[in-house]
């Protein structure tokens, strides 16, 4: 009987942690237009440009950021998620100053959020928090200081970036492999998920998935 009860408890625990997944499609959006259901904004100055495009290398429409701003930002409307995940496929196309793609979570607004980004010029993946418009890198669990993790980020290739966030603990996965975990309590409330680039990065996004932990 005890074994059965333990098994039931474990099953309930697993079910409680199931994530309700939503997938984003740009098929209904016009090519060259901003995607519906998202708010295009920025942290800092500049003119970001988010458009839906048809990419010959992808079977469906994709999203492109080709403007220039301090940090171009695209927030998903009607997402208030405290614990959950966001996952993307991205392709870094161009950029002299930067060539980056990032995912955002728990965003209060354009100046307050978490982001983890991959950079094809630096070949690394780095977690940050942006507080009142000021960005600072986060320490990785088990290591004090440093600047993210070195990782090959080849340009013009589709790559996967994912973050899972529960409470103050964040787990970052790149190309399907866990890179690191982060512990931070700056933003503990639910917020929006989103997409992010930096400076003159020209970046493509596809297969955007997100969800909340039930």
Regions found by a protein language model. Name each.
Residues 168, 173-194:
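Short, solvent-exposed beta-strand-to-loop segments that form ligand-recognition rims
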Residues 134-162:
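Short, aromatic/His-centered strand-loop micro-motif at the edge of beta-sheets
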Residues 26, 88, 163, 206-210:
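Extracellular beta-strand elements of beta-rich domains used
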Residues 31, 65-135:
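Secretory/extracellular carbohydrate-interaction modules
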Residues 33-62, 68-70:
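Extracellular glycan-recognition surfaces and repeat-rich motifs
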Residues 6-15:
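Bacterial N-terminal signal peptides
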Residues 187-214:
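Ligand-recognition surfaces built from glycine- and aromatic
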Residues 16-22:
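Boundary at the C-terminal end of the N-terminal hydrophobic targeting segment
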